[in-house]
């Protein structure tokens, strides 16, 4: 796997969970002899919602909710075959979305 790069993007609603998963990926890649860049924190996406509390009147009474989507990126430079096998066997938390791109 000469001159290749694996880019792993992680998404989660819980920042502790995503940091733990990113650290597991970095530890696994370093243990198998690959160079690692990251984890790089990407901008957090914040979605805000305003909901009327009253079904009829009182337009001023509202509840505010938000969803934060945290993102991290890990680049693995010059991965070995052992690195790819170890990453495939890695069991991450259920609340983390993983996207892998080869470049």
Swiss-Prot record:
<dbReference type="GO" id="GO:0006412">
    <property type="term" value="P:translation"/>
</dbReference>
<dbReference type="GO" id="GO:1990904">
    <property type="term" value="C:ribonucleoprotein complex"/>
</dbReference>
<dbReference type="GO" id="GO:0000049">
    <property type="term" value="F:tRNA binding"/>
</dbReference>
<dbReference type="GO" id="GO:0003735">
    <property type="term" value="F:structural constituent of ribosome"/>
</dbReference>
<dbReference type="InterPro" id="IPR027486">
    <property type="entry name" value="Ribosomal_uS10_dom"/>
</dbReference>
<dbReference type="InterPro" id="IPR001848">
    <property type="entry name" value="Ribosomal_uS10"/>
</dbReference>
<dbReference type="GO" id="GO:0005840">
    <property type="term" value="C:ribosome"/>
</dbReference>
<dbReference type="Pfam" id="PF00338">
    <property type="entry name" value="Ribosomal_S10"/>
</dbReference>
<keyword id="KW-0687">Ribonucleoprotein</keyword>
<comment type="function">
    <text>Involved in the binding of tRNA to the ribosomes.</text>
</comment>
<dbReference type="InterPro" id="IPR036838">
    <property type="entry name" value="Ribosomal_uS10_dom_sf"/>
</dbReference>
<protein>
    <recommendedName>
        <fullName>Small ribosomal subunit protein uS10</fullName>
    </recommendedName>
</protein>
<keyword id="KW-0689">Ribosomal protein</keyword>
<comment type="similarity">
    <text>Belongs to the universal ribosomal protein uS10 family.</text>
</comment>
<dbReference type="InterPro" id="IPR018268">
    <property type="entry name" value="Ribosomal_uS10_CS"/>
</dbReference>
<comment type="subunit">
    <text>Part of the 30S ribosomal subunit.</text>
</comment>
